[in-house]
């Protein structure tokens, strides 16, 4: 995920945005930085239920035990939210993911209070799915 910032830089960049329009544009930009998801990865087993838009998340564990995430969505803002979640879970093992609470990061970014209820529910669905897959691997 060399194209994406680390957690601390994400937070700094987000807080530098002057208003929510800039923050949404930054989220969309993060989504554009995600690598292209292969067509064969857009399968029902990688589809996230509970999202208003189509969302696919692929989780693989590398030889060092670190989880590598790939994902995509048919909506630009949702794809950006996928990127934010991936940044928060970057370089973690399955057990790290299970133990890590992303909510304090969302609070620092004031993210969830500026999302529509359906986007917030979709974000929670993504996090639940990632944590469930990680729990199965740990």
Curated annotation (Swiss-Prot):
Keyword Protein biosynthesis: no
Main location: cytoplasm
Keywords for the protein's UniProt record, in alphabetical order: Cytoplasm
GO cellular component terms, semicolon-separated: cytoplasm
Pathway: Cofactor biosynthesis; iron-sulfur cluster biosynthesis
Domain of life: Bacteria
Subcellular localization: Cytoplasm
GO terms, biological process: iron-sulfur cluster assembly; sulfur compound metabolic process
Pfam families: SufE (PF02657)
Residue positions of the active site: 51 (cysteine persulfide intermediate)
SUPFAM superfamilies in UniProt: SufE/NifU
Known partners and oligomeric status: Homodimer. Interacts with SufS.
Function according to Swiss-Prot or TrEMBL: Participates in cysteine desulfuration mediated by SufS. Cysteine desulfuration mobilizes sulfur from L-cysteine to yield L-alanine and constitutes an essential step in sulfur metabolism for biosynthesis of a variety of sulfur-containing biomolecules. Functions as a sulfur acceptor for SufS, by mediating the direct transfer of the sulfur atom from the S-sulfanylcysteine of SufS, an intermediate product of cysteine desulfuration process.
Family statement: Belongs to the SufE family.
UniProt name for this protein: Cysteine desulfuration protein SufE
């Amino acid at each position: 995920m060399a194209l994406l910032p680390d957690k601390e830089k994400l937070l700094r960049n987000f807080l530098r945005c002057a208003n929510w329009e800039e923050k949404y544009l930054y989220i969309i930009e993060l989504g554009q930085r995600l690598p292209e998801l292969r067509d064969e990865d857009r399968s029902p087993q990688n589809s996230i239920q509970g999202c208003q838009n189509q969302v696919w998340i692929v989780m693989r564990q590398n030889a060092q035990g670190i989880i590598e995430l790939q994902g995509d969505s048919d909506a630009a803002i949702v794809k950006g939210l996928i990127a934010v979640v991936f940044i928060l879970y970057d370089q973690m093992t399955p057990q790290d993911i299970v133990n890590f609470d992303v909510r304090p990061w969302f609070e620092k970014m004031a993210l969830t209070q500026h999302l529509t209820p359906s986007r917030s529910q979709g974000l929670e669905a993504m996090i639940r799915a990632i944590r469930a897959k990680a729990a199965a691997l740990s």
